[in-house]
């Protein structure tokens, strides 16, 4: 089985394990002091958490593309049931695509989006949207 691997620095591996267990609905496949990894089946993902205090949350953002708006809505509901704060965006233009998405932040601040692409779009973002795939993203705004 092939899967994407993401290795993330986290400030507190215990706190991160609680969050990612809720986010993906699975427990860690391996747990060691300062280390954990998850073998997520859907979406196929190997997530590695490495405790590195002070370096957590340093990525721009991470994402999971799903097939439909219904899957975005289901994820939003599941995350709300787990008391994880979400920010939903429907019909936004980002990275030359019209998307529905929901955002969450892990305990170290790394932003995650669960999104579906509805259609191609002529630009990166509609005027008034948060910085998306622009120089503004480098200033800390999440980008798709």
Describe the role of every protein-language-model region.
Residues 46-50, 113:
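Conserved beta-strand in the GNAT
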Residues 63-111, 119-122:
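Vicinal oxygen chelate
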Residues 32-35, 56, 95-100:
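Short acidic/glycine-enriched loop/turn segments that link adjacent beta-strands
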Residues 51-52, 117:
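Residue-level structural signal for beta-strand termini and adjacent loop
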């Amino acid at each position: 089985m092939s899967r994407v691997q993401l290795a993330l620095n986290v400030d507190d591996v215990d706190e991160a394990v609680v969050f990612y267990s809720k986010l993906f609905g699975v427990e860690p496949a391996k747990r060691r002091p300062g280390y954990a990894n998850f073998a997520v089946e859907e979406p196929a993902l190997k997530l590695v958490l490495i405790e590195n205090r002070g370096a957590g949350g340093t990525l721009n953002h991470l994402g999971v593309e799903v097939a439909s708006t219904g899957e975005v809505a289901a994820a939003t509901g599941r995350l709300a049931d787990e008391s994880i704060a979400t920010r939903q965006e429907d019909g936004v233009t980002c990275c030359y695509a019209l998307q529905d998405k929901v955002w969450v932040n892990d305990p170290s601040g790394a932003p995650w989006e669960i999104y579906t692409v509805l259609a191609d779009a002529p630009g990166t973002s509609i005027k008034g949207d948060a910085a998306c795939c622009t120089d503004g993203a480098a200033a800390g705004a999440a980008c798709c």
